[in-house]
Curated annotation (Swiss-Prot):
It comes from Mus musculus (Mouse). Residues 554-606, 661-686, 691-710, 1245-1276, 1322-1361, 1862-1885 are annotated as: Disordered. Ca(2+) 1 binds at residues 1464, 1470, 1519, 1521. Its main location: membrane. This is Fer-1-like protein 4. Residues 1974-1992 are cytoplasmic. One of its GO terms (molecular function) is metal ion binding.
């Protein structure tokens, strides 16, 4: 099925250049190699294209010849466009044609082509000669233009396109990093190859009828399970507030927990762990809200002030690897003030685990710095730290087709009284990230119109995945949910850079689904209306639109014009009542405002608070949506079988519906336009077989259901029923009217086809890999080629696809799909080019990621059509249903856009609503077709030709047939594996029922087995298969295999169901022998094993005169030879049965452990029976199990015939029985080993498979050494668990220039020094004296693997650099149990758990753990019997120690526990450890640790254990209670026996380096040389030879490092004996590299073991950090290692406050207006708030200067390694004991203003981390606010320098008072600034990342002195200025403001600083006095002047 083109020859080429021929067909371009030639060129290359089964008529092939150049772009020489219509009819053409140049002239260049066409069905098309009747008058008419051909893009245009793309990437601020990396990484490929090259792609056919699980899969249900949400609140930083008392509240769902309250700090440290448990479905858990809120505690608890809140849903955490956020900072924002910026950060660790998840304990938390907050935020990958505010607008317009029946008590009473439907009062509730908004209530309407907009304010992008729309009924008593729809924000938005867009949706209809409308008082399926599960009933649809507006900048607040009617969580308002409802047309015009009217030309303003606003909208215009079109849903019921026998009493009918159309209760099928009147709702659809328009009187009568028929039993021996549909097939057709948005679903179907081909190909590849057969790499290559070709075809087709009435989401989604598929084609091409045999697994993993992306893109968020519901009626009652997406059956003219099930017979499984998962009520074979009414003619085109419609004028009412084609089905059932146990014995009596069509047959019953080997052939004769004969190969019928457990006294118990597709053999097809396949069994959502079988569907031959018979080429044709003489069953034919080969199975019987009671009796004489392939191997009967549970006869063997293929070999069954009196046997337990591959003798492989593999990979793997190297496979969660435990730097070794100070004295180091150095090493930041590679070069040597002859002689000339010895020895830290690292120590002794009872070993959850009855310890070895003759003794006994009792000394080292589950009501626990083995028990109850969830134990417990009596060690953590019994927190179990006997030597770990004494003294009972000698003796090697710098072991030579001097040049006395021990230790640590004999030995380690509780299996209860040492009692054991916790060192910190300067002046003199402050300093160490100290008050400081000379003295306990202060105090007022709390060593300095009457005013603060504090400035002039920044330098460690003095700034966050003061100063226009305001702005204030401004409010001169308590007692000092060593009183007056005592100072501050003002005032006063005197004397002088002459 392909077009093949061979380019043979080129002639007439100009000049000599590099030529290349390019061929383009349907948008796919392929190129030849570059040929350097002259005028002629021989090409000789072959190319192939797929055609998807569509004809070539109208298609063309474009051929172009270009000149290639290394510098310039390719220059085209000529083009030829060939029509392929003649090729379609001829099948083969040889052409020699001339090319046409750019000016459309015939050029002299000619090309010779050989074209071949392979049609899809082997027949070519027809040639339409009339299409070529026009005579050709010009040579130009030879050219057929190709509309899809485009000229090559010139260089300028390509450069411009890249510039535009780069500009878009830079302009867009949001996007995922992965997308950008992919684009940038593929950019060079785009420059070299503008088109993707593919060749020879043949697309695989897509199966629909029997593809895996059918469409009506009842297993896809929501199953509730147990989840744990763990939240560790570590610390908070940069909390906004002044002298706050913060605590953090964590809320998950409805559960809320709070931390302790810390006083007077903005950077509290908590380290508290909270555990939340839920029993929910995963879907519901994703929607739960995580809310982290910081509060400022007040005097009364309910008066706490909110600082900030962080919200996200748990779905974000589930999307992370392992559902884990580790030590991330959650940014806090105030919902009431969105303009305030970030309010602080809370550092948390978040984990979400389900039952059974692999434990991933986080590293122990430690206080971190705030320097990397912005780079380590609690945000998903790709989300930027700076998130702007955004407004999400949800526009709710109207609803249609709502239910008319109210449920509940009042609805039932109303219907009983009035006998009529009770209309609803609907309203819509929208939920978004904890916020809820509601529309108004529309009373008693089924088609309400709201036209309202709900606005939500949230940060962008929002940390949620869902937007929930819920339609509710405003009932009188309690509101009821009618239906729920969840919009996935990931589907309506994209964060990519190239095709990203903000959340947008609609306007579009949202379909609503829920439960069946019932009149009962209680709806059992009400959860479906709440959105918990898939709805089973169409409840109407809702017209909504969603948009999001992002605010980029900060805008000043403006008065809002909208009315707020609802608020956060419905606290600020209530929804409208009925009396407030507003009907359309009654709203005043002035009030009705469209949403877009509020937008103006100005930038939108940021809302002031997170409030939900409700606004009115204008109705949506009439032409906003697409026009209505008539749709036809056509169906034909071919088969109804597998019907439950309980439905036999009533007739059965069937109904299909889409929306409301098609329901038997609905008389009108026009639900979508029912409210528009009868004229508009009249259906005008063309009849099926008529081209004229339908008249009103010729409308079709809808068939709303099939005729009721009585069911009949199926043929055969099955209990099922079926409907008699042999001759007549009923038809169903439903007309409905919807908006025509079918192009949405067609585009989605195209993506689905690409995904389905990729999925099908990957499944086949995995099957081939499972069988280890050839062809897997070739099939993977073909799959990737199909991916590339399908993606490119979609991109080319998207350019021609038209969209009618698209909205914003449609346009954005079209761009996204084109970009994503284009990118996926390039990624697939990259995988295709890099595909090799050694990286196949990695390629499959990457291809699965592409598949997941394709499936996500294929989901249409705006479905235009509701789903199709198929209902089965029993009488008048609905009993079963199936829901089919309309997308799957939608018709399109283009095949790629057609639904996968459209026009095909599909298998549907009907399930009962609300039934248990896995229950199937019926199976249907149904033909469905959905399309436009104008395309109705095509609905019957895909029906089988032998079906004839009944005579009618329109659509057929039913189809009938007279002639039948008969088939024979041969069901070859070989075996089943892993079947569930159904009997109390832990076994089953399984049999299988095979059902196809209306026939059912049953296999024989095999008793007491979980792996039945039926080896049976079931033959179904005279089988009628519906469907087109030519489509049966691709669409075979479905075969159902039901496995049951046979009960003698009762019905059979269902065990599982599998589905299979038979291989179809038509008469003309050659016969192929079938191969056995695996079909998984499932029981609901639970895996129930697998069936190995194969099925053949053979068409019977009609050529004879007698009855139809099997064709002659079928083998075997006669089945009589397969009949078994005893049972009468047919056995498998030899061609199907696997080829058997004699194998020897050797069994090692070691012993039984932990057997419990059976039927209330103790086990006394057990025996082990092994069954494999019908043969049994029995062990001896233990004479007394209690005294010695080990077997004395260890090895037995048996010869069995097993299949040569390992994947077909049967499982091994292990049965443990007990021999009781009178010959009775009782089954104790059983175990099934499903695969025997791990027990096959190493080195035995199938030579035939090796040859085939070599032949297959010869062309795929490059030759040479590069092809032999294997790439690392993709990591798994198990590999992640094996990664070393990491922790933040603890500073034991220091960094930078202080490194030399950090090298401690070996005499001062202990085990904890080694432990913390190991933590630092595994963090990936080794110190300068430890620069070795962690992957295996820690000792600086390599295993010599040079020339083989040199290796045999033990010589080598390689040189290895020898590093110096580590300053501190380290150990290995595992963050999982040691068993996970070393395969459970089952290298030669395996442990098989025994189960008994129903459920077996494959049960889930609590049921599985309840069936455990003991363990069998042993092993197996399988190898061909032909090789057994060459062995003198059993191979399994090699290296097996003696099986005798032995006594051991076990030392259990308990380091600490992390994240323990709380056991007390206060959220804490009082843990202690209990270690037990049998009756031996040790505990630390007397040394329990109160009120801790992360206790540090440091305990060593010793036990004397004897094997095999006490093989298991139990380590449990209990909670100590004063009253009552202690509670178990969790426990872990360790198999001591396997550890002791393992070749990994797990009894005592190997140290990293050899030391005789000290903290790293050798602690094993044997020296390294003795251990190495013992290994050589066990492996048959000679004694190792020690040389200078090398050790020879066998034929290998290890280079070993010599003892290099330490870095301080100390010359140790190293003896030759110690040197040999160090060399032997080096060889032991690299023992795994010994060829054939090497195995990794356990190093010195600390393992992390998960703790579980028996009542909650699978749920992690914490982690225990520990290790154990095991020593034989006959060897003297070394002394135990001291791991007692380090006691904190008591320090005394002396802080002298000398002076302050530039302190903010907070008080104002009411008389003079002068500002001043009464300064005093307050200080304390965090965690010791009760020891808070204050200086005296410096009153009336007018310059900010203060003089104190005051000493603070603080005593605290300090842990140097952890850098924490240890505080012991009672956690509460009612606590009886003190608990230990740890805080970072931080000193707080605060400057306050003293007030006599009101509360004191806070001026500023400074927090200094004592281990890492900034050095102070030398003088106040150089002290700026920069010293208060994070990471300011230079820095020092006060615990090392011990004494420090300087000036430090105190800062304060700018508040409104500071802003007002600055505004007043600016308005006053002061010319002289104070001294403290002088300087640059960056020295006075700074802005943090949250936008908060901090200002400099003063400077403090202080002196710090740190002493140990012993030193302090030798030189005591007094507090304040007291003795001893008193400080002088400061040089300040007693009263700073006294005009008489201090007149000079008064003069300075009140006269001198204002002398200009005083002079001006004096001058004005003099002038005023002068004027007053003038005016006072003027009248007298005037009168005197006037009257003086008179007197004279």
């Amino acid at each position: 099925m392909a077009l093949t083109v061979c380019v043979r020859h080129l002639t007439g080429l100009p000049g000599t250049h590099d030529r290349q021929v390019r061929l383009c067909f349907r948008g796919f371009t392929q190129k030849t190699r570059k040929i350097h030639c002259g005028r002629e060129a021989d090409v000789g290359e072959l190319f192939r294209w797929p055609h998807y089964g569509s004809p070539l008529a109208g298609e063309s092939l474009s051929v172009q010849v270009v000149n290639c150049s290394r510098v310039f772009s390719p220059r085209p020489l000529g083009t030829l466009v060939i029509s392929l219509q003649q090729l379609q009819s001829a099948g083969h053409l040889v052409l020699r044609e001339a090319l046409v140049d750019e000016r459309l002239r015939v050029s002299p260049i000619q090309v010779e082509l050989d074209l071949k066409y392979q049609p899809p069905e082997g027949a070519a098309g027809t040639w339409a000669e009339e299409d070529f009747g026009t005579p050709i008058r010009d040579s130009l008419e030879l050219i057929i233009p190709n509309v899809g051909f485009q000229d090559m893009e010139p260089g300028e245009a390509q450069l411009e396109r890249r510039a535009v793309a780069l500009g878009r990437r830079l302009a867009r601020s949001l996007g995922t990093q992965d997308d950008e990396e992919n684009e940038l990484e593929l950019e060079p490929e785009l420059e070299e190859e503008p088109d993707v090259e593919i060749s020879g792609v043949v697309f695989s056919p897509l199966k629909s009828r029997a593809l895996g699980l059918p469409r009506g899969d009842p297993f896809k249900v929501c199953k509730a399970q147990d989840f744990q949400v763990g939240v560790t609140v570590l610390e908070a930083q940069k909390l906004v507030g002044v002298n706050i008392n913060p605590y953090v509240a964590v809320r998950v769902g409805d559960q809320r927990k709070v931390t302790a309250t810390l006083r007077g700090t903005n950077c509290p440290f908590y380290n508290e762990y909270f555990l939340f448990e839920f029993h929910e479905t995963r879907l519901h858990l994703q929607d739960l809200l995580l809310e982290i809120t910081a509060f400022h505690s007040q005097t009364l608890p309910f008066m706490a002030t909110r600082i900030g809140t962080f919200r996200m849903d748990l779905g974000m955490a589930l999307d992370q690897p392992d559902g884990h956020f580790h030590q991330k900072w959650a940014p806090l924002h105030d919902p009431r003030d969105t303009r305030a910026g970030t309010k602080g950060f809370v550092k948390i660790t978040l984990s979400v685990r389900a039952r059974g998840d692999l434990p991933l304990p986080p590293p122990p938390p430690c206080p971190g710095t705030s320097s990397d907050i912005e780079k380590n935020l609690l945000l998903p990958h790709g989300v930027q730290a700076e998130r702007p505010w955004a407004r999400l607008r949800v526009r709710v317009y109207r609803a249609e087709g709502l239910p008319t029946v109210r449920t509940g008590l009042l609805g039932s009473l109303a219907r009983a009284l009035h006998d009529q439907n009770v209309l609803l009062d609907p309203y819509v509730r929208v939920s978004f990230l904890g916020q809820q908004g509601e529309t108004s209530v529309r009373g008693e309407e089924t088609a309400p119109k709201w036209n309202e907009q709900l606005s939500f304010v949230e940060l962008f992008p929002p940390l949620t995945r869902s937007l929930r729309l819920q339609l509710r009924d405003n009932a009188p008593l309690v509101d009821v949910a009618l239906a729920t729809h969840v919009l996935d924000l990931r589907q309506i938005s994209n964060s990519g850079r190239a095709a990203g867009f903000n959340p947008t949706f609609g306007p579009a209809w949202v379909p609503l689904y829920g439960s069946l409308p019932s009149g009962r008082l209680r709806d059992d399926l009400q959860s479906l209306n709440e959105g918990l599960g898939e709805g089973i009933w169409f409840r109407g649809r809702l017209l909504v639109a969603v948009s999001m507006e992002v605010y980029e900048g900060r805008v000043e607040p403006k008065p809002s014009q909208t009315t707020q009617r609802s608020g956060l969580s419905r606290l600020t308002g209530k929804k409208k009542k009925k009396k407030e409802k507003t009907r359309q047309g009654q709203t005043p015009a002035g009030i009705l405002q469209p949403a877009s009217a509020s937008t103006s030309e100005d930038a939108p303003e940021i809302p002031s608070a997170m409030e939900v606003e409700v606004e009115d909208l204008l109705p949506l215009p009439e032409n906003a949506l697409a026009s209505f079109e008539d749709f036809l849903l056509f169906g034909v019921l071919f088969e109804a079988t597998m019907i439950d026998p309980s439905l036999a009493k009533k007739p059965i009918s069937l109904e299909i519906s889409i929306g409301h159309a098609g329901r038997q209760e609905e008389q009108s099928g026009q639900g979508s336009r029912a409210d528009e009147g009868s004229e508009s709702s009249t259906l005008e659809v063309q009849p099926l077989l008529e081209s004229e328009d339908r008249g009103a009187g010729q409308e079709e009568q809808e068939l709303l259901g099939t005729p009721a028929q009585w069911p009949e039993p199926v043929d055969g021996n099955g209990p099922y029923l079926c409907l008699p549909l042999r001759h007549r097939k009923p038809c169903l057709h439903v007309w409905s009217c919807w908006e025509d948005y079918t192009w949405r679903l067609q585009s989605s179907n195209s993506v689905c086809k690409v995904a389905e081909r990729l999925d099908h190909g990957l499944q086949e590849v995995e099957k081939m890999q499972r069988r280890s057969g050839p062809g897997a790499c070739t099939r993977l290559k073909q799959t990737l080629e199909e991916l590339v070709a399908g993606s490119r075809q979609f991109c080319h087709g998207a350019e021609r696809r038209t969209m009618t009435r698209p909205n914003a989401l449609d346009r954005c989604r079209a761009k996204l799909l084109t970009h994503s598929l284009n990118l996926m084609a390039r990624q697939g091409l990259r995988l295709l080019r890099s595909l090799r045999l050694n990286n196949m697994q990695r390629t499959v993993v990457l291809a699965k990621k592409l598949l997941a992306r394709l499936r996500f893109l294929a989901q249409e968020p705006q479905p235009p059509l509701p789903d199709v519901l198929v209902w089965m009626f029993s009488g008048q009652r609905r009993v079963a249903y199936a829901r089919i997406p309309a997308q799957d059956i939608l018709y399109s003219v283009v095949e790629e856009e057609r639904g996968r099930d459209c026009g095909k017979i599909q298998s549907l499984l009907l399930t009962v609503p609300g039934a248990a998962p896995g229950e199937v009520c019926a199976k249907l074979e149904l033909f469905l077709w959905l399309g436009l009414g104008k395309q109705a003619k095509a609905c019957t085109s895909e029906l089988p030709m032998d079906l004839l419609p009944e005579p009618s004028s329109g659509l057929p009412q039913s189809l009938y047939r007279d002639d039948f084609r008969y088939f024979q089905l041969r069901a070859h059932l070989y075996q089943a594996r892993g079947v569930l146990a159904a009997d109390d014995s832990g076994l089953s009596d399984p049999f299988a029922r095979v059902l196809i069509s209306t026939q059912c047959q049953t296999t024989r019953v095999l008793e007491q087995t979980l792996s039945p080997l039926w080896d049976e052939l079931l033959v179904f004769d005279q089988l009628i298969v519906d469907g087109r004969r030519e489509h049966l190969r691709e669409e075979p019928p479905l075969v159902v295999i039901n496995v049951f457990d046979h009960n003698k006294f009762g019905p059979a118990v269902f065990l599982g169901r599998a589905f299979a597709a038979p291989r179809v053999k038509l008469i003309e097809d050659p016969y192929q022998r079938p191969e056995l396949q695996f079909f998984p069994l499932r029981k609901g959502p639970q895996a129930a094993g697998e069936v190995i079988a194969t099925f053949e569907l053979i068409e019977l031959d009609y050529s004879g005169h007698l009855e139809p018979s099997v064709p002659s080429d079928v083998e075997p044709r006669d089945l009589a030879s397969l009949v078994e003489p005893i049972s009468g069953h047919l056995s498998l034919p030899p061609s199907v049965r696997p080829v058997l080969r004699a194998f020897r199975v050797e069994v090692l019987f070691w012993g039984l452990r932990g057997l419990g009671r059976v039927h209330l009796f103790e086990i006394e004489k057990p025996q082990v029976v092994l069954e494999v392939a019908g043969r049994r191997v029995e062990s001896e009967v233990l004479p007394n199990y209690r005294e010695n549970p080990n077997f004395t006869e260890l090895v037995r063997h048996v010869t069995v015939d097993l299949p040569e293929q390992p994947y077909l070999q049967p499982p091994l069954s292990i049965l443990v029985i007990e021999r009781r009196a009178f010959g009775r046997t009782v089954l104790v337990g059983s175990h099934i080993v499903p695969h025997m591959l791990r027990f096959i003798l190493q080195g035995h492989e199938d030579p035939q498979e090796e040859e085939e593999t070599e032949e297959e990979t010869r062309d795929l793997v490059p030759h040479g050494p590069q092809g032999e190297k294997s790439l690392p496979e993709a990591g798994t969660s198990r590999q992640l668990l094996k990664a070393p435990l990491k922790k933040l730097t603890l500073g034991l070794l220091g960094q930078g220039p202080e490194l030399e100070e950090d090298i401690p004295d070996p005499e001062e180091m202990d085990w904890w020094s080694k432990y913390y150095a190991s933590l630092q090493e595994f963090q990936g930041q080794p110190s300068s004296d430890d620069e070795m590679d962690e992957a295996g070069d820690a000792d600086g040597t390599h295993l010599i693997s040079g020339d083989r002859e040199a290796q045999e002689q033990g010589e080598t000339d390689s040189k290895v650099s020898v590093p110096r010895k580590k300053a501190i020895a380290t150990l290995k830290i595992y963050n999982s149990s040691l068993e996970d690292e070393f395969s459970h120590f089952e290298d030669w002794l395996s442990v098989f758990p025994l189960y008994r009872g129903q459920g077996g070993q494959d049960g889930e959850g609590e049921g599985a753990s309840g069936h455990f009855v003991g363990k069998f310890k042993g092993s197996f070895l399988i190898y061909p019997e032909s090789e057994a003759k060459s062995f003198s003794e059993p191979q399994i006994s090699r290296g097996v120690p003696q099986n005798r009792p032995i006594k051991l000394l076990v030392r259990v080292y308990i380091v600490k526990a992390t994240n323990l589950a709380p056991a007390d009501p206060n959220g804490k626990a009082d843990p202690y450890v209990v270690v037990s083995a049998g009756k031996e028990q040790r505990d630390t109850k007397e040394r329990y640790i109160p009120k801790q969830l992360n206790p540090i134990f440091g305990e060593v417990l010793e036990l004397s254990v004897s094997l095999p009596a006490q093989p298991e060690l139990t380590v449990a953590v209990f909670d100590h209670d004063l009253v009552g019994s202690d509670d178990l927190i969790g426990e872990t179990h360790i198999d001591l026996e396997n550890r002791f006997y393992s070749h990994h030597r797990a009894n005592c770990g190997l140290a990293s380096q050899y030391d005789v004494n000290g903290y790293n003294a050798w602690r094993d009972a044997f020296r390294p040389s003795q251990i190495l000698a013992g290994l050589c003796q066990r492996c048959g090697l000679p004694v190792p030879e020690y040389r200078a710098g090398a050790v020879k072991v066998g034929s290998r030579v290890f280079l070993t490092p010599s003892e290099a001097p330490p870095p301080d040049d100390r010359k140790p006395k190293v003896t030759s004996e110690a040197s040999e021990e160090a060399q032997a230790l080096h060889v032991l640590r690299r023992w795994q590299e010994m060829p054939g004999l090497g195995i990794q030995l356990v190093p010195e380690h600390v393992e992390t073991r998960p703790l579980y509780h028996p009542r909650s299996p699978g749920l992690l209860q914490g982690s225990l950090h520990m290790w154990i040492d095991i020593f034989p009692s006959d060897v003297p054991a070394p002394p135990p290692v001291d791991i007692k916790p380090r006691q904190p060192i008591s320090y005394e910190l002396r802080v002298v406050i000398w002076n302050t300067d530039d302190v903010a002046l907070d008080d104002v003199n009411p008389l003079t207006g002068e500002r001043s402050s009464d300064i005093y300093v307050k200080s304390w160490v965090k965690g010791l708030e009760q020891d808070r100290q204050e200086t005296d008050v410096h009153f009336n400081s007018l310059t900010g200067e203060g003089n104190f000379n005051w000493r603070f003295v603080f005593r605290f306990d300090y842990l140097p390694t952890e850098r924490e202060v240890s505080v012991r105090r009672k956690p509460g007022p009612f606590a009886l004991e003190e608990a230990e709390f740890r805080q970072p060593a931080v000193l707080v300095l605060q400057v306050w203003d003293y007030d006599r009457i009101s509360a004191n005013d806070f001026l500023g603060s400074l927090e200094l981390q004592l281990p890492d504090m900034v050095r102070g400035a030398r003088d106040p002039e150089h002290c700026s606010v920069r010293l208060a920044l994070d990471g300011a330098g230079p820095r020092c460690n006060l615990f090392r320098c011990h004494r420090l003095r300087g000036w430090w700034p105190v800062v304060k966050m700018k508040d409104m008072e500071d802003v007002e003061r600055e505004a007043r100063e600016a308005q006053a226009g002061k010319k002289r600034k104070r001294k403290r305001r002088a300087g640059r702005p960056e020295d006075l204030e700074f802005t943090d990342t949250g936008g908060n401004v901090y200002i400099l409010t003063g400077k403090v001169e202080a002196e710090f002195e740190l002493l140990t308590v012993e030193e302090a007692e030798k030189r005591p000092v007094g507090k304040g200025r007291k003795e001893p060593e008193p400080l002088e009183k400061p040089n300040r007056p007693k009263t700073s403001f006294n005009w008489f005592v201090n007149p000079l100072k008064t003069f300075i501050f009140f006269i001198w600083r204002r002398y200009w003002r005083i002079l001006v005032l004096l001058l004005l006063a003099l002038i005023t006095i002068f004027l007053l005197l003038v005016f006072y004397t003027i009248p007298g002088q005037i009168s005197e002047v006037i009257f003086s002459p008179v007197h004279k």
